[in-house]
């Protein structure tokens, strides 16, 4: 593996926190709106951002892809959103769950909570829960908004309305603090969603990215493309010493030497920084991420000599 390629991977993983902060800021450019108690409603809201970021956030500069998809599917005029689906597929092919690890504001929020000094618990024994997010994607994002409709043929955005904690964190709380009318209108649904947010906050302090692992439908969608994404993990078998440090460092419970592009891998780069021989790195292009050592080839003359003996 070239030193230049390995060095770039180390640099990217080292500055991941700054990249996450920058992505969160770009996703929420209109910060003065927090004081005004209103929403940005310009042309940017016609474009989806890659991560989970609520449309109702006063500072949001774009639309949440999950919320936008449900709005179209639940509409009485349309039955499917080709634009948003195509947008998500494109991001999935280009980046996969790199978006989760580097560009998602709510993922970064959970990581910051996890830095609070307290006893941490592993999620390795809770791996079956990782399949819940696929059920959330299928049922709450696709099926219910499309088929559970009212008298005029409109469906609710079930994930956003009943489950997503980001909507409360970025939308309901700041808007209600700045707007007395919204504050007076808060009811039982807000109480339910606020309880979910509190649960995610507490779990995030103890577990690493619990919402990302277990419930996020956007992460589930990107995970479907992790194995074919152009942005992948690369393991150089010729320099790997099988020390296991990469697997111990991974907080997403992935052994990169066995499955470099596992569906749960968010390309955070912890394994890259933990590897003592720089055998693990990021790569961009096609392939399975495994670089097998090249077997030495015997000279032709030597082979002919051995055959005649």
Predicted regions and their residues:
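Non-ligating segments of multi-cofactor redox enzymes
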Residues: 1-257, 263-309
